[in-house]
């Protein structure tokens, strides 16, 4: 990932591999070949291992991440409910955890999300997920990057 600056507008250049998944402004895009794209306008996007599938949200920290992801890249009508769900899940996790460090991280994630900086909130939530994985002894999530491409629809 690199940024290049033009006269007035900054662009973001991403190199994506075959099979990579990217969500831009709520629209999922799967790349069939290796490609390089340039985002020339502000967009809400995640790609590769940043994207969590709904069925992977199977622990408290992962549910927080998924709710924040929805608040960030969901369709317009999903973003508000995603943020509300994240608030509730963060509150519940903060009440249940004995770790002051995790409480502080969750508080920062909530503040970032409420300040419309869901990308930063997601980065913090990933740290909470790693902590949870270590404490519970569960494996980290696999990357969706190499999921097989679906067969094209007939017709």
Label each region the model flagged.
Residues 1-155:
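Terminal leader/tail segments of proteins
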């Amino acid at each position: 990932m690199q940024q290049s600056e033009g006269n007035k507008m900054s662009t973001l250049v991403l190199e994506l591999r075959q099979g990579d998944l990217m969500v831009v402004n709520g629209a999922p895009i799967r790349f069939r070949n290796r490609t390089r794209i340039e985002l020339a306008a502000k967009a809400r996007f995640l790609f590769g291992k940043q994207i969590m599938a709904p069925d992977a949200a199977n622990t408290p920290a992962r549910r927080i991440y998924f709710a924040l992801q929805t608040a960030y890249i969901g369709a317009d009508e999903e973003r508000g409910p995603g943020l509300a769900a994240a608030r509730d899940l963060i509150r519940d996790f903060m009440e249940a955890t004995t770790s002051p460090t995790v409480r502080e991280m969750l508080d920062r994630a909530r503040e970032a999300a409420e300040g419309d900086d869901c990308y930063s909130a997601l980065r913090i939530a990933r740290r909470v997920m790693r902590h949870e994985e270590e404490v519970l002894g569960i494996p980290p999530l696999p990357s969706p990057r190499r999921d097989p491409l679906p067969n094209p629809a007939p017709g």
